[in-house]
Regions:
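Catalytic-core regions of core metabolic enzymes
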Residues: 1-539
Length: 539
């Protein structure tokens, strides 16, 4: 149905007591103008009725278990969905189809697939919420360009965390170019990425940067084992492969701690020329005596204190002569450690990999991808067991704050009313005033220009430190004013603030803003001249 006729169709649907409508049509908010008006009208109809709408500008959905496929994606023709406990929620129909297709090729069963498009009504947050509440869903993959209802989105992520269901999230629009593309695609305003990053982390979802990583992590959740620690054990037949994985583990914040000395001695007794530290190298003796594999792994799990193990077997596991004996050895090794996660990095045929999977052993070819997937499982283990601290919200103070840019002195006075004590100075409006307040102190003074038009004082020469005498203070006062007039001639100057120097400690920056999506947020990080250079801040 063309966009200009959709509103009439939706109105007719309401008259016939329809409960849901799926709108494939494009030509709405994503093109602006008249399309935006059409979409607003659809939203109004939903608000005034019991109708729920998916879309417009979406590719539909499916339920593989009930074989319900209201979608026009061509992927269904090429790959009939395999029912499973993984589901997909995507704002983009085409990219949602891409995620489904590569999932199918990976052998992952997808139960529900939902694309939300422009979200005149149903949002991706609501879709995640529905999936999190469904007992038939264990893992959720989500593609998000923007969030319109921050509270709803947070509640969905929190529901999934409480249910111990991994949410693997691809949030795009990180760059200015990407954000602009998102806006033209589904009329999405991407928002400040640093805030999204913190929301995702704080509420237990795992953010990925690629489809490959998304699929790897979803695949790794199949055993439903989420370690609560970050200690990684590596067993390998290749010293080089072990080094590669150790580096990758360091990159993602995992610990590759050495085996205890007693355990190392026992490993040496089994294979004198083995490397018993961690990575544990079983060497080529592996080919002659596979019984060393369960012995090594047992020592690693019983004495090494590792929360998960990755085994690097390269193409050996794919050998017809070695694949089954190795699998038998791994089954023996893990028979007493069903609560531990073990990931194989190996190169083998699809049949061999599936055979290993049926026995509960994951297989990821690239060892660094195996490490990243293990890190994701450990991340979920940490988040699923994280205690949520309840914050006592104080009633707001009734303070009259002027609706204009405030200078530094005014800001300090307001913050003091909230019991935030800062290094308050004196405002000087002429050089003669310095004599009235200057006293010799050990650490000296700092002088700063005060202007609501100047955010970064260093850039305009508006600050001077370590002032140790009255004459120097008078000289610096004149220098600061001259610097500012030269470099920022249009700035309105309220004066110069003089404060005692404070040495030692760490200079920090603290800020607050009302985000249009998530509401009030607080920013904290490294302050001073390093704020813009290092950008070491968190929300």
């Amino acid at each position: 149905v063309p966009a200009k006729f959709v509103v009439n169709v939706i109105e007719d649907a309401v008259k016939k007591n329809a409960r849901t409508a799926l709108i494939f049509s494009s030509g709405f908010s994503e093109i602006g103008g008249e399309g935006k008006v059409y979409q607003k009208k659809i939203r109004e109809i939903c608000d005034q009725s019991n109708l729920r709408v998916i879309g417009p500008n979406c590719l539909g959905l499916f339920n593989s278990q009930s074989r319900f496929y209201p979608t026009f994606t061509s992927t269904i023709d090429r790959a009939t969905p395999i029912p499973g406990d993984i589901s997909i929620a995507s704002q983009s129909g085409a990219y949602g189809s891409h995620i489904y297709m590569v999932s199918h090729q990976r052998g992952l069963g997808i139960r529900y697939w939902i694309t939300t498009g422009n979200e005149a009504d149903l949002s991706v947050g609501e879709a995640i919420q529905l999936l999190a509440e469904d007992d038939n869903v264990h893992t959720i993959m989500a593609y998000v360009e923007s969030v319109k209802n921050g509270k709803q989105f947070i509640n969905a992520l929190e529901t999934a965390r409480q249910e111990k269901k991994p949410v693997i999230l691809m949030k795009v629009g990180r760059s200015d170019v990407g954000a602009a593309a998102a806006n033209s695609h589904t009329a999405s305003l991407a928002g400040e990425d640093a805030i999204y990053e913190e929301v995702v982390r704080a509420h237990g979802a795992y953010r990925v940067r690629s489809t490959e990583e998304m699929l790897d992590v979803a695949y790794a959740t199949k055993p439903k084992i989420y370690p609560t620690g970050k200690n990684l054990g590596i067993v390998t037949i290749s010293g080089g492969g072990g080094v590669l994985m150790a580096d990758a583990a360091s990159d993602v914040g995992l610990k590759v701690g050495a085996m205890p000395e007693g355990a190392q001695k026992e490993l040496k007794e089994i294979v004198p020329f083995a490397s018993p530290m961690n990575p544990v190298d079983v060497t080529a003796q592996f080919f002659n005596d596979l019984s060393i594999v369960p012995k090594f792994i047992d020592l690693m799990l019983s004495q090494g204190g590792y929360d998960g193990i990755i085994g690097f077997w390269t193409s050996v596991a794919g050998s017809p002569k070695m694949s089954q004996p190795l699998l038998n050895a791994l089954k023996e090794a893990m028979s007493n450690y069903s609560e531990k996660i073990f990931i194989n990095s190996m190169v083998a045929s699809e049949d061999i990999v599936k055979h290993y999977e049926k026995e509960g052993f994951l297989s990821i070819e690239d060892p660094t991808r195996a490490v990243v997937s293990m890190a994701a499982l450990m991340y979920f283990g940490e988040k699923f067991n994280e205690k949520i601290e309840k914050i006592e919200i104080q009633p707001p103070l009734k303070i009259n704050i002027p609706k204009r840019n405030l200078n530094e002195i005014e800001c300090v006075e307001i913050l003091e009313k909230f019991d935030i004590n800062l290094n308050k100075g004196k405002l000087i409006k002429n050089v003669q005033e310095i004599k009235n307040i200057y006293k010799d102190i050990e650490d000296g003074y700092v002088m700063k220009v005060v202007s609501k038009d100047i955010q970064h004082k260093t850039e305009v020469g508006g600050i001077s430190i370590n002032i140790k005498s009255l004459i120097e203070a008078e000289t610096k006062y004149d220098e600061i004013l001259q610097n500012v007039k030269t470099k920022s001639p249009k700035a309105l100057i309220d004066g110069v603030m003089i404060s005692p120097m404070i040495k030692g400690g760490v200079e920090a920056i603290l800020g607050a803003k009302v985000d249009p999506v998530f509401g009030p947020v607080v920013m904290f990080g490294l302050g001073g001249i390093y704020t813009e250079v290092l950008k070491d801040i968190s929300f």
